[in-house]
């Protein structure tokens, strides 16, 4: 699968009721193994089952990989800015992994916004991936850990200015997260001079 694609997971109850949810892939490449990261929503129809009930050996109905718009490939040579909110990191970690695996020379930078350090996905992976070719910036909306470069708060114009590749370098930008986060960040990027056509977004809702 390509970095940034997703799959549809369908669950069928004993009475025939079906629920389908889309989940981004944290994996990419030619492997037969796919990796999903599921953020459990307690009142959700699908995520609680995937998190609490699925066991090794269980079979799931999966369709995909799907998507050709929100993808990054190593053939792209322009700078790449990734911006994630919460579990929106999943398709972006796939891009970062592929960037490292293929030895891409394209500058890549990630701004990862979470409520607190405990809410972050792939903390260890990001620490291992971070190098001169892949910069990682953190934004904490509720509680910033000791030693953080900035106090806790929502991503704003100052965050974009300090922690992203400037529009003058003409990066491709990928933004993924909850709908409100994605819309707010996209507006901030446009205000900072990024052309809308260079901003690709993916948002999520139901679980």
Show where each model-derived region lies:
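Histidine-anchored nucleotide/phosphate-binding helix
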Residues: 89-101
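Short, conserved phosphate/pyrophosphate- and ester-handling motifs at nucleotide-, phospho-/glycolipid
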Residues: 4, 88, 178
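Ferredoxin-reductase
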Residues: 1-58, 114-116, 140-143
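Conserved beta-strand elements of the Class I
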Residues: 80-83, 173-174
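A short, basic/flexible loop-to-alpha-helix module at the beginning of a structural domain
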Residues: 64-77
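Reductase modules of NAD(P)H-dependent flavoproteins
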Residues: 107-207
């Amino acid at each position: 699968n390509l970095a940034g694609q997703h799959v549809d997971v369908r669950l069928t109850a004993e009475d025939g009721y079906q629920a389908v949810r889309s989940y981004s892939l944290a994996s990419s490449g030619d492997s037969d193994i796919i990796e999903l990261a599921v953020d459990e929503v307690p009142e959700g129809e699908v995520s609680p089952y995937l998190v609490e009930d699925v066991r090794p050996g269980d079979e799931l109905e999966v369709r995909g990989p799907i998507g050709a718009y929100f993808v990054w490939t190593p053939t792209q040579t322009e700078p790449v800015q990734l911006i994630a909110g919460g579990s929106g990191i999943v398709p972006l970690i796939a891009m970062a992994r592929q960037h490292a695996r293929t030895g891409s020379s394209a500058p890549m930078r990630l701004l990862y916004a979470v409520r607190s350090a405990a809410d972050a996905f792939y903390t260890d992976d990001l620490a291992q991936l971070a190098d001169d070719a892949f910069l990682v910036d953190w934004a904490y909306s509720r509680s910033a850990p000791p030693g953080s470069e900035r106090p806790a708060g929502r991503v704003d114009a100052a965050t974009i200015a300090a922690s992203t590749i400037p529009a003058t370098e003409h990066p491709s930008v990928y933004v993924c997260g909850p709908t409100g986060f994605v819309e707010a960040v996209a507006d901030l990027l446009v205000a900072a001079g990024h052309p809308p056509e260079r901003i690709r977004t993916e948002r999520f809702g139901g679980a």
